[in-house]
């Protein structure tokens, strides 16, 4: 199997993780009981961490190096390889722990924003925003 096709399998796995995050996020906004927030934040953090680890893994980087040296078959494949290189370079700059903490904080912040907006009380959301921006 070519390096490009092996990369496609990894990207598919990352897509499964991120699309699962999207479903959990939608559930949080529509049906999730408020008492499930802490567990949902842990779920989101876990999935985000797994996707980040997979994207920045040594295996993925080695396959990308190989895919760049093997001539991609089509212009779209070449664009995919360039885009993946950009994504990996960006992701490598962020420590895994920070990525997971940001995900967990954002999940809590989203719930706080909904409550603060319903009560027209921004002070309920301010600490979450401050933490996200720090």
Go through the PLM ranges and name each one:
Residues 1-134:
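A well-structured
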